[in-house]
Amino acid sequence: MKVLTTALLLVTLQCSHALSPTNCDASEPLAEKVLDLINKGRRSGYVFELLRVSDAHLDRAGTATVYYLALDVIESDCWVLSTKAQDDCLPSRWQSEIVIGQCKVIATRYSNESQDLSVNGYNCTTSSVSSALRNTKDSPVLLDFFEDSELYRKQARKALDKYKTDNGDFASFRVERAERVIRARGGERTNYYVEFSMRNCSTQHFPRSPLVFGFCRALLSYSIETSDLETPDSIDINCEVFNIEDHKDTSDMKPHWGHERPLCDKHLCKLSGSRDHHHTHKTDKLGCPPPPEGKDNSDRPRLQEGALPQLPPGYPPHSGANRTHRPSYNHSCNEHPCHGHRPHGHHPHSHHPPGHHSHGHHPHGHHPHSHHSHGHHPPGHHPHGHHPHGHHPHGHHPHGHHPHGHDFLDYGPCDPPSNSQELKGQYHRGYGPPHGHSRKRGPGKGLFPFHHQQIGYVYRLPPLNIGEVLTLPEANFPSFSLPNCNRSLQPEIQPFPQTASRSCPGKFESEFPQISKFFGYTPPK
């Protein structure tokens, strides 16, 4: 018995490796590639850009290296499926939102080649800091940034109805998700800036593949006195259209996520525009123009003080190289290194009806609105518990928003969620099915099936106020091993490190240096 115990202990010690702290600045090139893989695997929200590496550890075994990274990020203005360059994503004089976040990531590399990099899992938390930075007592325009944009699906549908009136080819499209909503109040007007995704629901009413979807920005304008959001005085809307089957992978770095799936990409098709209320109507037919050379937004007009920004007549045309967002999957050990299986049974799901909180209060006080669904998170996959960088910054856990869940490809060509009218607000921002529902699609099964190999989550938390700091994501990833694949040494996935590397955090790179204070620690000078 003692011999057996000793043997088991030796095997355990061989498979377990102490994590080595590493330099955050030196880890930045790899962190950029890891974040690129995360962006390419997402189907909702906005592209993350790296602000800095805030912590970095690694574990080596043979030719494999497992990285444990904490990445401070900022949301760009580019939707995750857009092919535009960052400078071209936002129209001139359009209200933007500053959203910061942190992602805890476990990634594996088998060699120094970028195609051998894979993401094993990640958790992210995000919060808007726009109100804290932009609204002052002297502000001529007050801006409200709503964390629960799904409450404005009606406004998104109204804008899309206007767009479909002027663009008959889009009759079969429906609102997929309200992504951002900003309210601007000043002068005699109140404007709502609503950004949302849409998808084609029929193969019969669109002259392209059914796997077509798009992203729209709509401006709904009201008189300052009105409280009726059902009848805007004017609606301006522009949409981009994408088709994931137009092009295959053109990226130098193929994302590997651990399981075999078709490789898909998408291509931005020509922008169509629609405006009403004494504006010139503009409707462009679908097409795919070549990208312009040397696009520069330096001539973008600045917002005049006291004036509410208006939607421009058209958005900048497509620019930038095609980017692959659909991950490829491969079980084979002959052509590519194997990548880790994500553990099963660890998905946060929506569990409470609208208006009922699963927790008592929010870390930042009340929501902008009074009725939100809240999540029931299992251990290990929610932003609760202890954090590797110290105590919880607020003394509370981040309640409220759940991670993004369902995928555009989880639905058929014309398969809106059953037994609901545009979701009826039941599950906000694509969070998964209630407990007890199958994650696989089938008759009578969950409204929002998770993709069967989703390995990461993004939690949208309430906006931050002056003096508050971002709630960090949970880093207690479940323990799991990489497939053997006849390799002599395989690193065991270790618990996420609980102490920060002495060579961290890295240099804070941002055009918004004032946002560093929302991360709860002072960046190195």
From Swiss-Prot:
Keywords from the named record: Angiogenesis, Blood coagulation, Chemotaxis, Cleavage on pair of basic residues, Copper, Disulfide bond, Fibrinolysis, Glycoprotein, Hemostasis, Heparin-binding, Metal-binding, Phosphoprotein, Repeat, Secreted, Signal, Zinc
Gene Ontology CC annotation, any one: extracellular region
Domain of life: Eukaryota
A single GO molecular function term of this UniProt record: serine-type endopeptidase inhibitor activity
UniProt biased composition (Basic residues): 339-404
Region (Necessary for endothelial cell focal adhesions and anti-angiogenic activities) residue spans: 345-379
Residues the record lists as Phosphoserine modifications: 438
Description of its domains: The His-rich (HRR) region contains approximately 12 tandem internal repeats of the 5-residue G[H/P][H/P]PH consensus sequence. HRR binds heparan sulfate and possesses antiangiogenic, antibacterial and antifungal properties through binding Candida cells, and preferentially lysing the ergosterol-containing liposomes at low pH. The tandem repeats also bind divalent metal ions and heme.
Protein name per UniProt: Histidine-rich glycoprotein
Species, as recorded: Mus musculus (Mouse)
